Amino acid sequence: IRITINNESLFNSGEAILLPSFQPILEKLALSLEGTKGKILITGHTDDSPISTSQYPSNWHLSLARATQVANSMAKNTGLMGRLWPEGKGSAEPLVSNTNSDKALNRRIEIDLLF
């Protein structure tokens, strides 16, 4: 089972701090997943627009930081710690071409339930 969340709902551009407006939704999702078994893979994806900051030297670093933030948020006040596995893919697995009109679809978090 895969849940895909558009990054615009979760993060500001170039950042890995969760937007406060999405926090309650993520908490409800985490609580609902407590009743499941198996690992939960959280994968961060970006578009191919280059980023190079001291905090995020590449899209891979940004995507991993975002996946880690989602995992940390989901682990808070739940029994999911130890089942959550964050990973970053950067721009390596786009859903669509990275044209200006489509690239936003490539900026996402995927949550996979691995039974």
Regions found by a protein language model. Name each.
Residues 23:
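P-loop NTPase nucleotide-binding module
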